[in-house]
Regions:
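Signature of Gram-negative chaperone-usher
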Residues: 1-144
Length: 144
């Protein structure tokens, strides 16, 4: 997997609960020939301003299964995913144990493909204005 692009959420606080979304394309390449499948796992730190205010550790989710497509000009066997949604991205002051956000069952996921995840971020009405950041770790491992 190549380094995933950053995810940027943007919200204008208006005194109401909001959900903002952002997409992230994850380029996955499995040329092992093992047909063992693979897992994308993720974890994160809590969204914080650095000055105190934070968002809930359950604020980032994936509401429905990511889309997937073979990369242009390549041949692939699209991944068959068994992860249930909605998915909550684990978060904590120190990133907790990563969990599966997407997987390829055995005999699927061979070749080059892009898995596109639509992340949702819950922004409560009482959110203190500021720039919130979080560090995410997304990993690719062999096996169903």
């Amino acid at each position: 997997m190549s380094a995933p692009p950053n995810v940027n959420f943007s919200a204008t606080l208006n005194g109401l609960n909001q959900t903002v979304t952002a997409t992230q394309g994850l380029d996955v390449s499995d040329a092992t020939g093992s047909n063992a499948g693979w897992n994308l796992t993720a974890t994160s730190t809590t969204f914080a301003t650095g000055g105190g205010p934070t968002l809930a550790t359950t604020s980032t989710t994936v509401q429905s299964g990511p889309t997937r497509a073979c990369d242009s000009g390549s041949s692939c066997t699209l991944a068959t995913n068994s992860v249930s949604y909605p998915y909550a991205l684990p978060a904590g002051a120190s990133a907790p144990t990563a969990t599966k956000v997407f997987n390829a069952a055995a005999n699927t996921g061979e070749g080059n493909q892009t898995v596109t995840v639509t992340w949702s971020l819950a922004v409560p009405a009482a959110t203190v204005p500021g720039t919130y950041t979080s560090t995410w770790t997304i990993s690719l491992a062999s096996g169903p």
